[in-house]
Curated annotation (Swiss-Prot):
Subcellular location field: Cytoplasm, Cytosol
Protein name per UniProt: Acetyl-coenzyme A thioesterase
Outcome after substituting residue 190 to H: Found in a clear cell renal carcinoma case; somatic mutation
Alphabetically ordered keywords of this record: Cytoplasm, Fatty acid metabolism, Hydrolase, Lipid metabolism, Repeat, Serine esterase
GO cellular component: a single term: cytoplasm
Enzyme class per UniProt: hydrolase
Pfam families: 4HBT (PF03061), START (PF01852)
Regulation: Inhibited by ADP. Active in the presence of ATP. Cold labile, it dissociates into inactive monomers at low temperature.
A biological process from GO: fatty acid metabolic process
Assembly with partners or alone: Homodimer or homotetramer.
Amino acid sequence: MERPAPGEVVMSQAIQPAHATARGELSAGQLLKWIDTTACLAAEKHAGVSCVTASVDDIQFEETARVGQVITIKAKVTRAFSTSMEISIKVMVQDMLTGIEKLVSVAFSTFVAKPVGKEKIHLKPVTLLTEQDHVEHNLAAERRKVRLQHEDTFNNLMKESSKFDDLIFDEEEGAVSTRGTSVQSIELVLPPHANHHGNTFGGQIMAWMETVATISASRLCWAHPFLKSVDMFKFRGPSTVGDRLVFTAIVNNTFQTCVEVGVRVEAFDCQEWAEGRGRHINSAFLIYNAADDKENLITFPRIQPISKDDFRRYRGAIARKRIRLGRKYVISHKEEVPLCIHWDISKQASLSDSNVEALKKLAAKRGWEVTSTVEKIKIYTLEEHDVLSVWVEKHVGSPAHLAYRLLSDFTKRPLWDPHFVSCEVIDWVSEDDQLYHITCPILNDDKPKDLVVLVSRRKPLKDGNTYTVAVKSVILPSVPPSPQYIRSEIICAGFLIHAIDSNSCIVSYFNHMSASILPYFAGNLGGWSKSIEETAASCIQFLENPPDDGFVSTF
């Protein structure tokens, strides 16, 4: 095994039956304890003083570990601020029979240094040795920005959520109440539960929270739920040996194959216990999946809120899901394998038809969730196997045939879409298929991105009234990647234009997101930007007041 890098702390654990659930899988609570321990020791290695967990970013679990396998956790400080540090944590699992290693999770937490007495702490900067160290150091500032604006973003989304309650509750046939999912449990903090400086161990609190949350989720599906992710949370206050910790859990909402469970933790010393006066020290939100006997994911029933508190928790889960969606692509940094196809003029007809069919299949998928609505615009998202798709629906006061002509000419796209700097025709393949080279604006001080795409348009069939404009990236030898740009990819995108009457239509824009395109949308999806709504409004304005340059009559 390679030696740990300077500043890195490594924990290796053989998974024993005592660490596992009834299914023989590593308990998520046990893993959270190990993660927190390793992160704390990495923080203290850098700070040289005792440290406590301040907050934990979203934790996504990509793989399940089982009895007999070995878990390896690596933690190191990515960036030190004045008194706090960001710790990156990487968790791997190895099968001892095959030697195969798989990624379980990449997570980030924040630790605060505890000064001795009244001494002020000013942490030394992190020594950056590799290119990856520099990347993580820069991303740490972005992640910190997201953490600091989390509360304001959440409150703004909660205010917005009431605008589309009708859209949500109109379709609640077969919905269920969450009252039967309420769970309460109590723990007495003993010396083995405390860390080496007297406070209740943060990882132990997380493990106890996970236990009650799992029970709550199981009462909704009557199956064995497994933890998929933990929402970002911060520790509100400390507890110590002798405290009684009361954990209360309840299902907040469901999203197709996911269920969110909220857990509240209150701490009581002896006097507070007698008086019934607790301290709220933590709230966390855990997201579960559940599988049937054939290991297929179960679709959870929709939730029907009844009380005022039910509605608050229901809306809160929707807001958190939206924030989580955007934050996921800031906090994680996944590379992807390009899916572009090579353009072959001899296969032009089949490539164009598959382009159109892919868009129609994306539009027909089930499980789209409303995330935003404003005046003439609705935004939906769909997550499948950690791949995100977006659907933007616009009501336009313009004939469908005119909208089709305007939107199918991509040279006009920069007039209304700020994500397009330029769009030039490479080749007119046919009357209904064109190849374009697109350039995009600079984002996050990086080089600008560019794209080579096939745009295929189709008029409605005789018995239909929907126009189609489909887009996907292709590889074209005549336009190779340029060092001036980062070559990016559109997997599947485009417009479906549905006529309402002779003077109005619904324009639906779909995009099956690639990692290279996501940064332009992450802020909007996360709730701290309005770029999608602003672009949609600009599109409506463009379609209702088209440029008078002879384009409409000649195209």
